[in-house]
Amino acid sequence: MLFSGSAIPLSSFCSLPEKPHTLPMKLSPAAIRSSSSSAPGSLNFDLRTYWTTLITEINQKLDEAIPVKHPAGIYEAMRYSVLAQGAKRAPPVMCVAACELFGGDRLAAFPTACALEMVHAASLIHDDLPCMDDDPVRRGKPSNHTVYGSGMAILAGDALFPLAFQHIVSHTPPDLVPRATILRLITEIARTVGSTGMAAGQYVDLEGGPFPLSFVQEKKFGAMGECSAVCGGLLGGATEDELQSLRRYGRAVGMLYQVVDDITEDKKKSYDGGAEKGMMEMAEELKEKAKKELQVFDNKYGGGDTLVPLYTFVDYAAHRHFLLPL
């Protein structure tokens, strides 16, 4: 459930620097080190336009993908979560950015990008249910089950999962994406949401047991980031080795954002500093892991504007109002 913490408005992404490598560092010397200083990209790359344009396109395509049909109630519940204001759109943006890294066509990536957001929304609907995490609020607004009831929320989530697969098959341009690639995309998403992915993480989160915290973080939060990056790589024509680098990158980013959210929440609750220090160290380690994988592409292809959006996922986490030890 990648980036499933508090809502972040589009303006927050717009506040990212247009030239990442010239980002002025306003944090204290003990602050988390940003990858911006080493991020590739030309002086002319307009990051703000990239993010706003891409998110606007994704929102439009998601709106078109889920029209209200009969019975209207279930479609309204589906749209409530998928089109929610404040949604970060991290999975679809990461997918498109990874596709474009390898020269892929954005038009080829949009159907899968939208499918990833549908799956992400479905997982959050189910996550918030009283029988799961019992969260009455999502992104500052009532959760799906709070508005529509638990029964309808379950149905809305159940409907979004197959709709995601259907959308990939019916909307992916056959002249841009081979059938074999479509099959791999579906397999990747199915693995992510199933008993070896997010479902496993949610199970352990519910039941506990002899599992390390990293297992829950990897399965429940890292899996969606991993899937988003890999799907983009598949659409862009990445090699198997490159897909593995994307897999490690996405997993690290997904886990990083959750750790950051946990740190922020702990600061609000004034927990003891010992646990917080451990989480800060974990966040720094995850950040470095994500950067390491991107540097593989930087070294291989000589950097360039196409890497900047993927670096910003790491940089944005690094500047979310918390400090890490050097």
Swiss-Prot record:
InterPro entries: Isoprenoid_synthase_dom_sf, Polyprenyl_synt, Polyprenyl_synt_CS. CDD domains: Trans_IPPS_HT. Isopentenyl diphosphate binds at residues 88, 120, 139. Its main location: plastid. Binds 2 Mg(2+) ions per subunit. It holds the Pfam family polyprenyl_synt. It is found in: Plastid, Chloroplast thylakoid membrane. Residues 1-33 form a transit peptide. Mg(2+) 1 binds at residues 127, 133. Heterodimeric geranyl(geranyl)-diphosphate (GPP) synthase small subunit. The small subunit alone is inactive in vitro while the large subunit GGPPS1 catalyzes mainly the production of geranygeranyl-diphosphate in vitro. Upon association of the two subunits, the product profile changes and the production of gerany-diphosphate is strongly increased. This is Heterodimeric geranylgeranyl pyrophosphate synthase small subunit, chloroplastic.
